[in-house]
């Protein structure tokens, strides 16, 4: 069972998340990047992450919801919105403008050719989702403080019911992404719930309570891949308790990396998680398809894709930090 670094007292689950949000987000971002890679599908470890790596999104949203509550506690609602806007808008627009320029130079963004969607990065469902979640978070927080369990239950029930409504639209229309947003809303609200009502069970107990749900989620994905069952409307709800176990596994992974003096790798991925999300798929696809890289082997393309994604993420943050320091809105 994890313990605090400075004493022998047992680390609570909320302390584990509060102290480890950066490296846990790093775990989530690595899972997302492995899920989206398609360079080395013949290797079992790569195939595993293509099956299960999408849970990185769930882990990321749980941590985001948890962090949003602390932001709302410290700031007025107005300042909260200002802080969210400063974090999202400049980064998304700078990355979008760079993608547009690269697109005009022959590096293609295959997911959209709509200039507005490309520049704002709203064509990426996750960016659209966090914009929606951050917008409604103060209202959800208001209800969670008063009716915590009831609010979470209502959100979960409405999410399941809304999944029964078919939504079909052109990918360039934002309505086409509402299904993704609706499905992941409960995990975001669950993160907020944990911050409002800290879990009182031990970390060990939480791990074992969430493990069956994680294993069941894995089994359902395997069955779906084998073609033995249809998508269940409540499947994403299984990931609420499962995500708690994933947080603890991420913490143990971090401790392993710390033991071999490599823990800063997770912190780097976590620190630049937004920028990495904005860039990695664009870079993956162009490295795989561009004629300049056609003679490279697939493993080399994968390593190059990750390295270039990290470089672009770092440069994007560096540019934003420079511009914000010299801009009136950044002061």
Give residue ranges: language-model regions:
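Membrane-cytosol interface segments of multi-pass membrane proteins
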Residues: 1-162, 204-206, 260, 267-272, ...
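Alpha-helical transmembrane segments and terminal signal-anchor/GPI-anchor hydrophobic tails
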Residues: 9, 178-185, 199-275, 282-287, ...
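Loop-centered beta-sheet repeat module
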Residues: 151-197
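Histidine-centered divalent metal-coordination motifs
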Residues: 36, 277-280
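Long, hydrophilic "mature protein body" segments
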Residues: 12, 36, 73-75, 141-145, ...
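Specific aromatic-rich, kink-prone transmembrane helix
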Residues: 135, 139, 189, 193, ...
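Membrane-interface helix caps and helix-loop-helix hairpins in membrane proteins
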Residues: 42-48, 115-120, 167-178, 224-234
């Amino acid at each position: 069972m994890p313990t605090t670094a400075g004493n022998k007292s047992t680390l609570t689950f909320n302390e584990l998340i509060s102290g480890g949000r950066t490296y846990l987000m790093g775990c989530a971002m690595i899972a997302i990047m492995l899920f989206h890679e398609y360079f080395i599908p013949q290797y079992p470890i790569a195939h595993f992450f293509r099956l299960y790596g999408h849970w990185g999104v769930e882990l990321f949203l749980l941590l985001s919801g948890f962090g949003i509550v602390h932001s709302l506690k410290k700031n007025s609602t107005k300042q909260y919105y200002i802080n969210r806007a400063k974090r999202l808008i400049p980064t998304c627009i700078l990355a979008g403008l760079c993608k547009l320029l690269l697109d005009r130079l022959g590096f293609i963004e295959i997911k959209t050719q709509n200039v507005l969607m490309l520049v704002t990065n709203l064509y990426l469902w996750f960016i659209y989702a966090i914009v929606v979640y951050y917008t409604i978070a103060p209202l959800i927080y208001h209800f969670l403080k008063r009716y915590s369990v009831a609010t979470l239950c209502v959100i979960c029930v409405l999410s399941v019911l809304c999944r029964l409504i078919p939504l079909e639209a052109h990918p360039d229309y934002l309505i086409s992404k509402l299904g993704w947003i609706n499905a992941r809303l409960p995990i975001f609200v669950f993160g907020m719930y944990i911050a409002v009502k800290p879990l009182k069970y031990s970390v060990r107990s939480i791990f074992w309570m969430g493990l069956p749900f994680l294993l069941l989620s894995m089994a359902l994905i395997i069955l779906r891949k084998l073609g033995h069952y249809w998508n269940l409307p409540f499947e994403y709800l299984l990931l609420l308790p499962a995500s708690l176990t994933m947080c603890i596994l991420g913490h143990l992974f971090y401790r392993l990396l710390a033991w071999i003096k490599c823990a800063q790798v997770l912190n780097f991925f976590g620190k630049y998680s937004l920028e990495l999300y904005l860039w990695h798929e664009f870079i993956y696809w162009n490295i795989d398809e561009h004629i300049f890289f056609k003679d490279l082997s697939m493993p080399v393309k994968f390593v190059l894709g990750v390295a270039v994604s990290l470089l672009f993420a770092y440069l994007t943050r560096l540019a934003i930090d420079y511009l914000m320091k010299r801009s009136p809105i950044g002061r």
